[in-house]
UniProtKB/Swiss-Prot annotation:
It catalyses: L-arginine + H(+) = agmatine + CO2. This is Biosynthetic arginine decarboxylase. One of its GO terms (molecular function) is metal ion binding. The gene is speA. It comes from Shewanella pealeana (strain ATCC 700345 / ANG-SQ1). Pathway: Amine and polyamine biosynthesis; agmatine biosynthesis; agmatine from L-arginine: step 1/1.
Length: 637
């Protein structure tokens, strides 16, 4: 493709859309990041940055965080809601709450909080869904507005800790997920001498569409039905505690792709709010939960990997629906709260790693079959003759199907002993030559070619063996078929020479990236420039800042990767800071209750028994270094 341009590369990987301007491709074909979105012209080349890290002793794979992107995302959400409030003359304010379950890393939480430090009135709170998260939030929330929302199932200890948080000066909302929690809250509040701030999570009839739609709807794991809501109201009235009910919460599910679903959910929850107010409650906060999506594939569509709306439209819909409803039912307008963790964190982190090798299916030169060869082999040779000639476009489809059918029959005859190994190998090579020729001859402009083109792209894709664990670093790609953008970090100024699939280094056939962003869609292979041992390039996995670290598992005992924080200083210089070493072999052994110290003693016994005395020290040193080493590959040249 001699007329390949950088614009072609940008379109091929759709980077301008899924990255929202945070990542891009430079004119020399290098992937860049704008680490401080307030200075978009200040870009960093990820390829050179990764190489510099390696030179400084940080082994790949490495997860790189850009905290200034977190700041920008927080402020963008707050600004969108503030503008919507002004536009619709909404008579209250907005609070952004970060649910730390999305990414509990201290660096991430602290940077999110730091984005609001300079604000006269911070618009940021924190959410916890478990006792460990609550303990973290109680210590960290003082750096924000001190608003804490407690979700999830709760026992007595969780509830007491939340109430103690109120005594520590925080505004702690205990959201009731089930009826039994109310009694415990009231008992413990009385014992501690605290007036609780209560919230209700209502279970809406409406259910948004998406991978996480089970979070909402009538069969949701969480929340109270309409009848249970009335029971709570009556119980609070009997205890003369109705004033404590300050927050209404609902959750449609994470990654809601369709703005109509959001609008409909807010409308139904708004009716709950108005009815509660009519019953005498004094609800002050309307918490819409999560749902603000990330456009992972950049298609701006209703697919589960995308969203058909922007941030401004999201805020406008929520504010306008609530404004109209409160006016219609003559109720005061509550403070709006959203818990938009995925949107805040996804873009800020990228995994950078190396390719340890490739396997390409290249056809070999073939000779025609012997005259006395089975007719089946002559049929396959005829397919090759036809496809290498000037077959018309429709004939190409027939040739493909005939050749695949013949190859299937070859395999069957081989299995029953009627064809030998050499004949099978010859047939497979002919089929490969036919497929390669067809791949170059077919065109996606012909609708009837497209299914076969997709098959050929998969069949002929190169295998890239990449130094990472899918299960540790991209667990959602394996578990729920989530799409994450993948790109080579350099060489994009040259036309792709092949298509490839990315395979991790675990001993599991599931360790394969099955879906790739390409153009305005999702493909099963990725276009890539030429890769050789002499001119290798690195691979980047993008938008991995939400959920992936905490959900990652240790399949094959591949542990946490190295990580680093990269910041742009006031002079536009790149600062690599807060480098955290990933797990060592000893670390991951300890996670599964294997004792590296006792292993070392065993090694010493074995070395003394089996190794010559002059070799023992070196062997023991290598074994000890093995326990201290990185779990990923470090020397594979």
């Amino acid at each position: 493709m001699s007329n390949w341009s950088i614009d072609d590369a940008r379109a091929s990987y759709n980077v301008n859309h899924w990255s929202q301007g945070l990542y891009g491709i430079s004119d020399d074909g290098e992937v860049t990041v704008s680490p401080d979105p307030s200075r978009p012209d200040c870009k960093i080349g990820l390829n050179e940055m990764a190489k510099d890290m390696v030179k400084s002793g940080v082994a790949l794979p490495v997860l790189v965080r850009f905290p200034q992107i977190l700041h920008h995302r927080v402020n963008s959400v707050c600004q969108a809601f503030n503008q919507a409030i002004n536009k619709y003359q909404y008579e209250n304010d907005y609070l952004l709450v970060y649910p730390i379950k999305v990414n509990q890393q201290q660096t991430v939480v602290e940077e999110i909080l730091a984005s609001q430090v300079a604000k006269e009135v911070p618009q940021l709170g924190l959410e916890a869904g478990s006792k460990p998260e609550l303990m973290a939030v109680l210590a960290m929330a003082q750096k924000a507005s001190s608003v804490i929302i407690c979700n999830g199932y709760k026992d007595k200890e969780y509830i007491r800790l939340a109430l103690i948080g109120e005594k520590l000066g925080h505004k702690v909302y205990i959201v009731l997920e089930k009826m039994s929690e109310l009694k415990v809250v009231l008992e413990q509040a009385k014992e501690l001498g605290v007036t609780p701030r209560l919230g209700l999570r209502v279970r809406l009839a409406f259910q948004g569409k998406g991978k996480w739609q089970a979070s909402g709807g009538e069969k949701s794991k969480f929340g109270l039905s309409a009848a249970q809501v009335l029971q709570v109201i009556n119980s609070l009235k009997q205890e003369n505690m109705l004033e404590s009910l300050e927050l209404l919460h609902f959750h449609l599910g994470s990654q809601i792709a369709n703005i109509r679903d959001i609008r409909q959910g807010v409308s139904e929850a708004g009716r709950f709010y108005c009815e509660l107010m009519k019953l005498g409650a004094s609800v002050k906060c309307f918490d819409v939960g999560g749902g603000l999506a990330v456009d992972y594939d950049g298609t701006r569509s209703q697919s589960s990997h995308s969203m058909n709306y922007g941030l401004t439209e999201y805020a406008n819909n929520i504010v306008s629906v609530l404004t109209d409803m409160c006016k219609e039912y003559e109720q005061p307008m509550p403070r709006i709260i959203s818990e938009s963790g995925r949107y805040l964190t996804a873009h800020h982190a990228v995994l950078l790693t190396d390719v340890i090798g490739t396997e390409a299916y290249k056809p070999e030169d073939i000779q025609p079959p012997a005259e006395d060869a089975p007719q089946l082999l002559h049929n396959m040779w005829q397919s090759w003759i036809e496809v290498s000639g000037k077959a018309d476009q429709r004939a190409l489809i027939e040739i493909y199907h005939d050749c695949q059918s013949d190859l299937t029959e070859v395999h069957s005859l081989f299995a029953v002993g009627q064809l030998g190994l050499a004949e099978r190998a010859w047939a497979e090579q002919v089929n490969l030559r036919v497929c390669y020729e067809l791949q170059g001859s077919m065109s996606a402009k012909y609708r009837f070619h497209r299914p076969v083109i997709d098959e050929l792209n998969e069949k002929l894709a190169d295998k890239f063996f990449v130094n990472f664990s899918l299960f540790q670093s991209l667990p959602d790609a394996w578990g729920i078929d989530q799409v994450f953008p993948v790109m080579p970090l350099s060489g994009l100024d040259k036309a792709p020479e092949s298509r490839a699939v990315m395979l991790d280094i675990t001993c599991d056939s599931d360790g394969t990236v099955d879906q790739y962003v390409e153009g305005q869609g999702i493909e099963t292979t990725l276009p890539v420039p030429a890769w050789t041992q002499e001119s290798p390039y690195l691979i980047g996995f993008f938008l991995v800042g939400a959920y992936q670290e905490i959900l990652g598992d240790m399949h094959n005992l591949f542990g946490d990767t190295n990580s680093a924080v990269v910041r742009l200083d006031d002079d536009a210089r790149t600062n690599v800071e807060s480098v955290l070493a990933g797990d060592t072999v000893a670390d991951v052994l300890r996670y599964v209750n294997l004792d590296a110290v006792s292993f070392m003693r065993t090694y010493e016994e074995l070395v003394n028994k089996h190794i010559a005395e002059d070799e023992r020290a070196n062997i023991l040193e290598e074994l000890q270094l093995g326990l201290k080493g990185y779990t990923y590959l470090e020397d594979f040249s």
